[in-house]
Amino acid sequence: MSKPTREEATEAVRTLLKFIGEDPTREGLLKTPDRVINSYTEIFSGYGKDVEEILNTKFYDTCNFQDFISLEGIKFTSFCEHHMLPFNGTVHIAYIPDNCIVGISKLARIVNIFAKRLQIQEKMTVQIAESVQENLKPLGVAVKIAALHSCMSMRGVMQDHSIMNTMHYTGIFAEQQKYRHEFLNLTTKR
């Protein structure tokens, strides 16, 4: 499959405007197709980013730190791959290092990479956890995502306050309940 040109994408937006009964040549909509393409270029910029590159800078002189490291409250907005409607929420990540750590901002960058793609929350949860596990090789990783989905609030069942929670664990978090419990206690308070 070849990538459409910018002109083809812009024309597709014009076609959608016509489909919903709008006139793409009226004054208020003249620049809308181009604005939509500019927005989508930014919103879906995660496709052009490499997680391995983000996690490439590791710190090995960590004073043998082998306790829980967590970053809580990472805000994100993504788009569901089923309806192309936004879902937004919060990600909590924890890991227990083995021989290296990563700058804490890198964890937020990973969330941004996966959020800026068409997604389902379940897959995004696994992608974040597994990418940290594969690149840092910690003793374990825990990820929890809590999100509101526009596909449930703007259409269908019209539930605008329902929050979906997903969790994924690797290593010691998957194997030992005490670590999961500590992680969930920490993230439930938020």
Curated annotation (Swiss-Prot):
Q: What is its EC number?
A: 3.5.4.16
Q: Show the InterPro entries listed in the entry.
A: GTP-CH-I_C/QueF, GTP-CH-I_N, GTP_CycHdrlase_I, GTP_CycHdrlase_I_CS, GTP_CycHdrlase_I_dom
One GO biological-process annotation of the entry reads: tetrahydrofolate biosynthetic process
Residues of the signal peptide = none
Supply the SUPFAM superfamilies for this chain. Tetrahydrobiopterin biosynthesis enzymes-like
Pathway membership:
Cofactor biosynthesis; 7,8-dihydroneopterin triphosphate biosynthesis; 7,8-dihydroneopterin triphosphate from GTP: step 1/1
Give an example GO cellular component term for this record: cytoplasm
For the ligand (Zn(2+)), the binding residues are 80, 83, 151
> What keywords appear on the UniProt entry?
GTP-binding, Hydrolase, Metal-binding, Nucleotide-binding, One-carbon metabolism, Zinc
GO MF, one example: GTP cyclohydrolase I activity
Give me the reactions it catalyses. GTP + H2O = 7,8-dihydroneopterin 3'-triphosphate + formate + H(+)
Family listed: Belongs to the GTP cyclohydrolase I family.
On assembly, the entry states: Toroid-shaped homodecamer, composed of two pentamers of five dimers.
What's this protein's name? Answer: GTP cyclohydrolase 1
Q: Which organism is it from?
A: Rickettsia akari (strain Hartford)
